[in-house]
A protein has these predicted regions:
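Short, solvent-exposed turn/loop segments enriched in Gly/Ser/Thr/Pro and often Arg
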Residues: 198-205, 228, 283-289, 364-368
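Active-site-adjacent substrate/metal-binding segments within catalytic domains
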Residues: 67-216, 231-278, 330-333, 337-338
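Glycoside hydrolase catalytic-domain groove-lining segments
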Residues: 334-349, 353-415
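Bacterial Sec-dependent N-terminal signal peptides
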Residues: 15-53
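Active-site clefts of carbohydrate-active enzymes
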Residues: 234-250, 327-329, 366-367, 372-373, ...
Length: 416
């Protein structure tokens, strides 16, 4: 059975919208929030005094167990300052879940409950293979770390040096050397529960590997990101289909795509990551535009002016095979799945030829594609982990169509 694990974007921190909570005069001076984990060592710290007071207890609708919680009201905006318009939503924090009582209240207790990868040492241990892998246990998919411990990846993306004079001055003042920078970063991140790095650590991946080699008991996991489509375009001297990078996915129909994936994975770009036990896996691209709310991929490819463009030829051939003239959402979903299948298949088959233990984390699906059955089906067929950039939502969605789709021989409901 194909192994898969759904990975939320919250595990790979990327961006935070502008947020404003309740004003000071809205707070109840007599309100006493519950205990939460904040402390260092074996000392429990006080709860921050400036958090907003929650509202009355309500049922959290998506909860399978009808759990109660006390919402806090959050004003947010995706606009850049100065902000003239705010949206308001209720959201949750763990401390305000009714009945929540933390089992671990101190840093010392936390450190005793996890290993060097941040994996649980209290949950049932699995086979230790020396590499990360996925495994389905009692109906739930897990990551298993190289030591055989069940693992929930918690990592920070974009760990890299800034380029401004202010960045450089601050870095030199506090760290001065790469060794101190990464050892300090690893320690400080691990103390708040983050044990790895994600995408976009440009210029830092090799430094992390040097740190890991020198500090085997306190590594940072890696999940390097690549740009397969743009690299393929550049190395083959192609243009984007129709001259637009929105159509980058159409490059999979161009001559040499699968062969190029083979050579790229066997080349210098991947050499340092193959068989490295601290590499969780890799992302081959980021947020591929398989469609958006305002732009369907099938429409875009059919609008390409050149009738010889391989992306246009593929789209036209698809429509001809259906015997139709007009694009529908259903046809677009099916065609997007064909494009995604061609993309993911080539990457996965290339991975298997060089390191069959290296997890393929997909392409950080974002926006419309994560709701498209054809795209998700293709990703589930070839990716070991389906990575989702889950933005613009204050709470998880339970009643999403993904729960009822079939991917491979098991339903998504079994895999989420």
């Amino acid at each position: 059975m194909k192994k898969i694990f759904i990975l939320g974007a919250l595990l790979f921190i990327t961006s935070i919208p502008m947020v404003s909570c309740t004003d000071d005069d809205d707070k109840d001076p007599n309100f006493m929030p519950p205990d939460i984990v904040m402390g260092g060592g074996d000392v429990e710290s006080e709860y921050p005094e400036d958090l907003p007071v929650p509202g009355a207890s309500v049922v959290y609708a998506p909860s399978l167990n009808a759990n109660m919680y006390r919402p806090i009201s959050v004003k947010y905006s995706s606009a850049y300052p100065p902000i003239s318009s705010w949206k308001t939503e209720n959201t949750r924090i763990i401390a305000y879940m009714d009945g929540y009582k933390p089992a671990i209240k101190t840093l010392k207790a936390y450190q005793e409950s996890v290993n060097k990868y941040g994996s649980s040492t209290t949950l049932p241990k699995q086979a230790a293979t020396g590499r990360f892998y996925t495994k389905k246990i009692d109906g739930r998919w897990w990551l298993v770390d190289p030591e055989g411990c069940l693992h929930l990846e918690r990592s920070a993306t974009s760990l890299r040096k800034g380029t401004s004079s202010r960045n450089k001055a601050a870095w030199n003042s506090r760290f001065g050397t790469d060794e101190k920078w990464l050892s300090t970063t690893q320690r400080e991140l691990s103390e708040i529960g983050f044990h790895g790095t994600g995408a976009f650590c440009t210029g830092t991946y090799s430094l992390i590997q040097i740190h890991n080699a020198s500090n085997p008991s306190s590594p940072l996991t890696l999940a390097p990101s690549f740009a397969f489509l743009s690299q393929f375009k550049s190395e083959k001297s192609y243009n984007y289909p129709g001259g637009s990078d929105d159509n980058a996915a159409g490059l999979v129909f161009y001559n040499g795509w699968a062969e190029w994936c083979d050579s790229y994975l066997a080349g210098s770009a991947f050499a340092d990551y193959l068989r490295d036990p601290n590499v969780l896996g890799f992302f081959s691209d980021n947020e591929i535009n398989f469609s958006s709310n305002s732009s369907r991929i099938l429409d875009r490819f059919l609008a390409i002016n050149s009738s010889n463009d391989p992306a246009y030829v593929a789209a036209k051939g698809f429509m001809d095979s259906k015997g139709v003239q007009s694009v529908t959402d259903a046809l677009n979903n099916e065609f997007a799945g064909i494009v995604a299948e061609k993309y993911y298949k080539a990457v996965k088959e290339a991975v298997m030829k060089v390191d069959d233990k290296l997890l393929y984390l997909g392409t950080r699906l974002h926006g419309t594609p994560k709701y498209m059955e054809g795209v998700m089906r293709a990703a589930g067929k070839y990716c070991d982990v389906i990575s989702i950039n889950y933005y613009s939502r204050w709470s998880p969605e339970l009643t999403t169509a993904i729960a009822d789709w079939e991917i491979g021989r098991a339903s998504c409901r079994e895999r989420v």
